[in-house]
Every structure is written in C-alpha cells, then in structure tokens.
Regions:
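Active-site-adjacent structural elements that line small-molecule/cofactor binding pockets in enzymes
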Residues: 1-181
C-alpha cells in the first residue's frame, strides 16, 4: 500500500545552523522522491546542551539574521532561475543549475516558520518572517518549561493570525493558502 496524499515535513529545522545550499539540495531531493509532498519547517532552534557541545551560541539576533539569509538562498536556489546572493553570512556566485534536479513544487517546497508573538511588543520580527513564507507554527511568549504552550489560548491565537493577515496584506498577499499549523 502506498500513500498519495500524506505530506512530509520537518518539525523543526534550525535552518540557521545549516548551509543553505545543502538544505535546499536535501529538501529538493525529498520533494522529488515524494512526488512534491514536502514542507520545510524552520525556526531559530532552541538551545540545549547537545547543540552547545558542538558550537558556541551566537545569540538569537545572529541566528535570526542567518535564518533569513538561509531562507533567501533556499528560495533563490530552488526558484528555477539563475541566482546569486551576497549576504552578511552566506553568498552564492551565479548559479544556473542545482544538483540534484529541481523540486516538483514551484517555485519551491513551502516553508513554515515559527511565528513568536510577544505580547505588548509593537514590532514582531518573528511574525514578520513567518508572514513572508507559506505557513506558521504559532507560539506565544510567556509559557513555562513545564507547559510551553500555556499562553497559546484561542484569543491569543486569533490575535496572532490577525497580525499575520495584516502583515501579509501590507505585502500584497492574502491568507488564502497560508497554513497555520
């Protein structure tokens, strides 16, 4: 028996800790193998001893900037057009062909981002990032280690989705086809 509808995805890839060209290549490979059914889920990545045993913490701000660059390169490499990039952390000389072959989904497999809403803060950078892509893993700041989702109440989720809708509208996009996971 084989499935034809189930999607494959990551929960959660700390993309800032990956080389964007390697990540794009791996996601494209799985997309082709699955017949176009992969989704890339990304976030900054929680810090814990396992990560810190291999690398120093660069801080949230650096990881956030790296994540934005990784996603820019990911979209550019898988977009089916010649691509080059120069950023603070990553660069790519003009690329005209990606090996392995391009993904099935165009312009690229969808990206779902953690969208953290911090109550009382006017600028929500995590939500701004999530609004630029195809879906969000909603999170509300203020949970505890024992109950990390404790602040994700129905009214808080409604506010988060409304903010995402406003951000997408500012960019000329709608919420149609946008996933809230």
């Amino acid at each position: 028996m084989a499935t034809e509808r189930i999607r494959l995805g990551t929960l959660l890839t700390p993309a800032a800790r990956h080389r964007p060209w390697d990540l794009a290549s791996r996601v494209a490979s799985v997309d082709r193998l699955s017949g176009g059914r992969v989704t890339l889920g990304v976030g900054l990545g929680a810090l814990h001893g396992n990560w810190l045993a291999f690398e120093a913490d660069e801080g949230r701000a650096v990881r956030a900037r790296k994540l934005d660059e990784v996603l820019d390169v990911y979209a550019g490499l898988l977009g089916g057009q010649p691509f080059s990039y120069t950023g603070e952390y990553f660069s790519a000389s003009p690329v005209t062909e990606l090996v392995p072959p391009p993904p099935v989904q165009t312009p690229h497999p969808p990206v779902w981002c953690v969208g953290l809403m911090v109550p009382g803060r006017s600028r929500q950078r995590s939500l701004e990032r999530a609004a630029r892509w195809q879906g969000v893993f909603p999170a509300i700041a203020g949970g505890s280690l024992e109950n990390p989702g404790s602040q994700l109440t129905p009214p808080a989720l409604r506010e988060l989705v409304e903010r995402l809708g406003a951000l997408r509208a500012e960019a000329g996009q709608t919420m149609q086809g946008y996933d809230v996971v």
